[in-house]
């Protein structure tokens, strides 16, 4: 990565940002399947032309002309598989459900199941999670569970006034 940055001529570039491939790790294992690689992320940008996007889910850089570099950033996403399943407990699905509710998104009784199943199939089959063995299966199951929980919570906000009243929608993050 350092060598890729050194080779850039930042004073004469038409690009306002540069994206690196994120090499996501679980423990010491590189996860190449389930859409986790190459997972491009902008980490070098001209602050006069690009800026943080106004998105509540994740911090991201809004750039009009980013360039993808042939270099990796190693990202230790989770120390072990257990942390991958602790993620729903950190309430990312609840935050996503709040954002969807604020945007007027609706769910029905089948939404949690269908969205959860769709997320699992997308990760495991279409993004080749089956090629990653246990890690690929685990990532796909985690994606399905997160999607299921997100829509189940959205449905709960729609159906249960006490739950809705107890939530602070001004504080999503």
Name the predicted role of every residue range:
Residues 1-160, 168-172:
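Catalytic-site signature of metal-activated, phosphate-bearing donor transferases
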């Amino acid at each position: 990565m350092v060598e890729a940055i050194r080779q850039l001529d930042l004073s004469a570039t038409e690009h306002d940002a540069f994206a690196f491939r994120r090499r996501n790790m679980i423990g010491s294992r590189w996860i190449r399947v389930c859409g986790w690689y190459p997972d491009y992320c902008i980490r070098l940008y001209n602050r006069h032309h690009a800026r943080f996007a106004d998105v509540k889910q994740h911090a991201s850089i809004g750039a009009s002309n980013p360039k993808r570099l042939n270099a990796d950033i190693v990202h230790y996403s989770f120390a072990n598989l257990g942390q991958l399943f602790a993620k729903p407990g950190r309430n990312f699905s609840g935050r996503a459900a709040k954002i969807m509710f604020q945007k007027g998104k609706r769910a029905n009784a089948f939404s949690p199941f269908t969205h959860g199943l769709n997320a699992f199939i997308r990760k495991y089959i279409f993004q080749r999670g089956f090629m990653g063995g246990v890690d690929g299966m685990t990532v796909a199951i985690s994606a399905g569970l997160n999607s299921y929980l997100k829509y189940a919570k959205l449905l709960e906000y729609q159906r249960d006034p006490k739950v809705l009243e107890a939530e602070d929608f001004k504080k999503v993050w």
